[in-house]
Amino acid sequence: MPNSALQHRTVRTLASAQVLSGVGVAGTVAAGSLLVSSITDSETLAGLAQTSAVLGAAALALPLARLTARGGRRLALSVGYTAGAIGSVFAILGGAQSNIFLMLLGTFMVGAASAAGYQARFAAIDLATDQTRAKQLSFVVWGSTIGAVTGPNLMQPAGNLAENFGLPRLVGPYLISAMTLALATIVIAMFLRPDPYLVANKESVTKLEKGDTKKALKHIRNNPKALFAILSIAIGHVAMVSVMVMTPVHMAHVDVTLTIIGLVISIHVLGMYAFSPVVGALSDRLGRVRVIQIGLIT
């Protein structure tokens, strides 16, 4: 298969998986904070769910990267999405039994699906040309927009589904998450063939160096652009996640329905991702650093 055709197939497959994982992960953000608040009877602790999920994504990012180096993107992404699906089951059990340990273990493992979703974006550029690299990555990000906007709007029907199984309404989004992340695993396992990472590594004149976590961190410390990128992500996420996590709690405090809470989170997520193709095109045209600077200012 020519690389151009393989690249188009790869992007379509990754975008499809991102739609499914987006539905699952985004739908659990509001539900997770509300569940933790309900279990602990404390609004102050509501942020623990998202904190646990973010820690899970961070902790599992490098292990998934090592899996990629050993066996390719298909292996790493499949493991990440599968771990997320299992985590959703733990969160369901934690919510049903009012067990905060199981709940936070579940949200931690759902973080693996987030880590896989982030790595799926970079899988889109394994075979991309320098001229279209950011644009192709942004299409996969945009694919997650569909799922991420849809997921929070399923809170009400997901709650109804949970009640039909005799479960608390707030675990409903985790039922959806378990199903959609399992489907994302199937999509990756069946259609991400041949593996873009393995193809790119085989055709590369310079073989990719396999290192450990210590070497990776040392490389980041010695790379100003990498440090700039990490700092930019950290600043953006502090503002974004703080608003995203606490808004549902405050809305629930004044008896806003799950339907409206889901709609508000969907609008927030739409703002996060909807313009990613435009940002990608601007990055190819103006440069990555300049676009990041514009984003931080705005």
Language-model region placement:
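C-terminal ends and interior cores of transmembrane alpha-helices
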Residues: 82-97, 298
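Juxtamembrane intracellular "pre-TM" segments in multi-pass secondary transporters
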Residues: 1-8, 193-230
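Short amphipathic helix-loop junctions that connect adjacent transmembrane helices
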Residues: 31-43, 245-264
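C-terminal membrane-cytosol helix-exit motif in multi-pass small-molecule transporters
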Residues: 151, 155-160, 178-203
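Pair of pore-lining "gating" transmembrane helices in MFS-fold secondary transporters
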Residues: 4-37, 108, 221-242
